[in-house]
């Protein structure tokens, strides 16, 4: 079975007690970031499974998705770096340029310079809250896909024709073809 690991990095919202502006009562995920990333990954998995099972009905493939977070008891950055080094991709929601998300993005960009097969970096942002002039120039060449929030039913859709889904589907299809190419090359060399 082929398992493709993808992590998502997005801001968490802090809830503060109304009477006391400094007492944090809870943190919770940003539901729109969560919905955008999960929706894209579900669609990628559906498309890839449909495509590979046309050629090979017995083919098994799965996407393992988790939010990017540290493991309890470990130094936070080491844990995040380790997860990124084992992933196919990390999707960063840079809406609002959250400091933790931007720090994690910096780690991913540094790993791209030092790993043989670094995780692909995909950036997403809520279109209504994204200000292109605030995007650091060093990120201008990276893939960025904006999503919109339908406030009537709290759904999320990407406004760029699903380019994130198409790009990830294409990349994963190439990855899944690679073991078959390597096997074919071995068989060809053995018979030469």
Residue ranges and their predicted role:
Residues 1-72, 82-84:
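Conserved N-terminal substructure of TIR/SEFIR domains
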Residues 10-12, 123-127:
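Short beta-strand/turn micro-motifs composed of small residues
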Residues 64-68, 124, 147-149:
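Conserved beta-strand termini and adjacent loop/short-helix elements that scaffold enzyme active sites
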Residues 67-110, 162-165:
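TIR-domain catalytic/interaction hotspot
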Residues 91, 120-124, 145:
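Hydrophobic/aromatic beta-strand patches that form the interior of the parallel beta-sheet core
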Residues 109-119:
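Arginine/glycine-rich "motif VI" loop of SF2 helicases in the C-terminal RecA-like domain
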Residues 128-138:
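Short, glycine/polar-rich helix-capping loops at beta-to-alpha or helix-loop-helix junctions
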Residues 137-192:
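C-terminal interaction surface of TIR/SEFIR-family domains
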């Amino acid at each position: 079975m082929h398992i493709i690991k993808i992590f998502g990095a997005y801001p968490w919202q802090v809830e503060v007690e109304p009477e006391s502006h400094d007492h944090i009562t809870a943190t919770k995920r940003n539901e729109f970031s969560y919905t955008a990333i999960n929706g894209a990954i579900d669609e990628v998995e559906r498309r890839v499974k449909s495509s590979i099972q046309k050629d090979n009905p017995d083919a098994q493939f799965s996407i393992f998705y988790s939010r990017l977070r540290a493991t309890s008891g470990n130094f936070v950055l080491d844990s995040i770096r380790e997860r990124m080094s084992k992933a196919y991709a990390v999707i960063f929601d840079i809406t609002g340029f959250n400091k933790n998300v931007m720090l994690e993005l910096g780690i991913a960009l540094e790993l791209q310079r030092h790993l043989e097969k670094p995780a692909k970096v995909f950036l997403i942002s809520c279109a209504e809250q994204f200000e292109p002039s605030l995007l650091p120039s060093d990120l201008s060449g990276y893939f960025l896909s904006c999503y919109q929030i339908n406030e009537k039913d709290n759904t999320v859709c990407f406004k760029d024709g699903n380019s994130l889904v198409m790009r990830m589907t294409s990349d994963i299809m190439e990855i899944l073809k690679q073991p078959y190419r390597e096997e074919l090359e071995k068989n060809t060399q053995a018979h030469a």
